[in-house]
Amino acid sequence: MADQDVGSVYTTWGRKSCPAINGTKTVYTGITGGKPYHEMGGGVNTLCLPHDPDNAPSNFPTSQESAAHMYGSEYQFTYGNIAWDDDVPCAVCHLKSATSVLMIPAKTTCPSGWTMQYHGYLVTDNNDGAHNYWHAFDFICLHSDPNYLTEGARQHNMDGHILFPVTAVCGSLPCPPYKAGQYITCVVCSS
């Protein structure tokens, strides 16, 4: 087995580079993307799309009438040095010294024996039902010190794949220890 095949791969959301922890290497940097919030169907996962895509052959597919759509992600909040509608960067990271990488919601520290790669806040699309956009999106851990993409125009509202911070709702989620309306943290840990 080659050296580069050992370890774990994870994505740092909201940053243009990987954390310099335990020999972490950047596999590639990219643009956070996913399906548009207003379209039914399609994928539910958020992707880190490379800056230098390889195009599909010109004869595939023969019709684009029934294609799913990929949009870049936009922040739908202001925090630190990012602003509403800024585009979201990402970096895919390889950690040779780890066999597992885990995102833990509602925590800012890792369990004993695990190493923190980064911590931040849960984000996802806002499915409040105000516009009848009932569909699924994944939750991702946005870095606590997020960047914005410098390519293109800042704060250009495309309203494609949009990211909102996540808050706790009491009921089946017990309060305490959770608090109604409180933003939910997250941490990415390796072992």
Residue ranges of model-derived segments:
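Composition-driven recognition of glycine/serine/threonine/acidic- and proline-rich low-complexity segments
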Residues: 2-191
